[in-house]
């Protein structure tokens, strides 16, 4: 970083090593960001459940907030989630095609609102059906289908909403930038929380 100011150094860690993004001078490894692989695992486990079973597994969704501020996290959808028989993001969701697409839209909505930088995987934004194959290109022909075009539009609009609303990305490593309003106690199918920016402005989600 001394040679290239502003460069990002992103770590991936599975062994539970702490202080990945703490400066070296303070005993850390000095990465600017770290993949939050625990978040990805919890989200895939939760959203892959049929809707009628999610209420009984809400802890997978809610617990992710308890560790969201341990590092400067990136919420990753990496290629590792979509190869070797793990299926595409769309195919991880239960139900018929329309239900799968609704699930993906819901997932991306939660992801955009949750603390942490975002990293999606190519094709997920329009509902790629096949898992990733480096021998072939993305299934662009799917965009001839209205449902896939609508998903692409939805994700594009979510990106615009994210960029326009400072509470969704400012000061997000600070625990004070997030608090639960209702973590599913009133209705286990609905969670509500607040995001707060550096000026104290709130966005209710």
Question: Residues of each region from the PLM?
Answer:
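Active-site beta-strand/loop architecture of penicillin-binding DD-peptidases
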Residues: 138
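Catalytic cores of secreted or luminal carbohydrate-active enzymes
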Residues: 146-171
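A short acidic, glycine-rich active-site loop
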Residues: 96-98, 142-149
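Conserved alpha/beta catalytic core and glycan-binding cleft of carbohydrate-active enzymes
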Residues: 1-134, 163-205
């Amino acid at each position: 970083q001394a040679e290239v100011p502003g460069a990002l150094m992103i770590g991936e860690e599975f062994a539970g090593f702490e202080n990945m993004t703490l400066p070296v001078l303070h005993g850390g490894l000095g990465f600017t960001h770290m993949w939050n692989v625990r978040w990805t695992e919890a989200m895939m486990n939760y959203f892959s459940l049929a809707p009628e079973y999610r209420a009984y597994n809400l802890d997978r969704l809610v617990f992710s907030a308890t560790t969201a501020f341990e590092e400067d996290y990136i919420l990753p959808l990496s290629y590792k989630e979509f190869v070797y028989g793990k299926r595409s993001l769309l195919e991880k969701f239960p139900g018929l095609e329309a239900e799968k697409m609704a699930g993906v839209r819901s997932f991306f909505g939660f992801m955009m609102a949750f603390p942490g930088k975002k990293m999606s995987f190519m094709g997920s934004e329009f509902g790629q059906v096949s898992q990733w194959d480096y021998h072939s290109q993305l299934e662009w022909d799917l965009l001839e289908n209205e449902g896939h075009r609508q998903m692409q539009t939805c994700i594009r609009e979510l990106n615009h909403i994210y960029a326009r609303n400072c509470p969704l990305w400012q000061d997000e490593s600070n625990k004070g930038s997030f608090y639960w309003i209702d973590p599913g106690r009133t209705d286990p199918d609905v969670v509500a929380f607040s995001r707060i920016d550096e000026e104290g402005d709130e966005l209710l989600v």
